[in-house]
C-alpha cells in the first residue's frame, strides 16, 4: 500500500539515503586497470565485449554498474566499498602484475569483495577468472605452423610482470619445439596490449633484420 501511494504521488526513492540505511548500494564497480604508459590509446576491444556482458548481467540482477579507468589508486577498498559507492569490485586488466597483486593482497586482508579477470595462478589472492592462455597459444602456433610458417615472431612481455603473456609464450614455444623448430629468443619483443605498442614492437623487430614469416 505504501508503494502504491508513493507511485500515485510520483515519489522517487532517494537511493543514497536508502543505501546508507541498508548498507547496500546495489552498485558494482568495474575498474579497467590500464597499462602504465598506454596514455590515450584505444581500449582493448576484448574489454569492450566484456563490458557489454557485465553491464547486461548486473542490470538483469537489479544492480547498477559504475565504470572507472584506473592507474594510480592505492586503496580501491576505501575508494569504493568504504565510501559506500559500491558493494563489490570487478577488475579488468591489471597493468604491472607485480604491483597489482600486492594491492589484491591488501584487499583480501581488509575483507573487500572483489573478483579479477586475468591470470589464474596458484596462491593468488581473491577470486580470479581467466583464459587458458597456454593451450590457446599452443593451438594458435600450431595453426601457423600448419600454414608452413617457421620463423614466427612473438610480441609481448613474457616476464613475471605479465603472466598471461608468459603463459602464451610458453604454449607458443611448446608448439615450435614439438615441430622440431628451435625457439629464437631474438624474435620475441616485449610489448604492451595496445595497437600503438604493437606497431612500435614490430618496428623494433624489423630493425633487428632477422627473417620472420609470421607474427604472434
Residue ranges and their predicted role:
Residues 117-118, 152-156:
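Short beta-strands and strand-loop turn motifs
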Residues 1-3, 189, 206-216:
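Short, intrinsically disordered, charge-balanced linker/junction segments flanking boundaries
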Residues 1-26:
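N-terminal helix-turn-helix DNA-binding module of bacterial transcription factors
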Residues 129-154, 170, 174, 195-204:
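Hydrophobic alpha-helical segments within soluble ligand-binding/sensing domains
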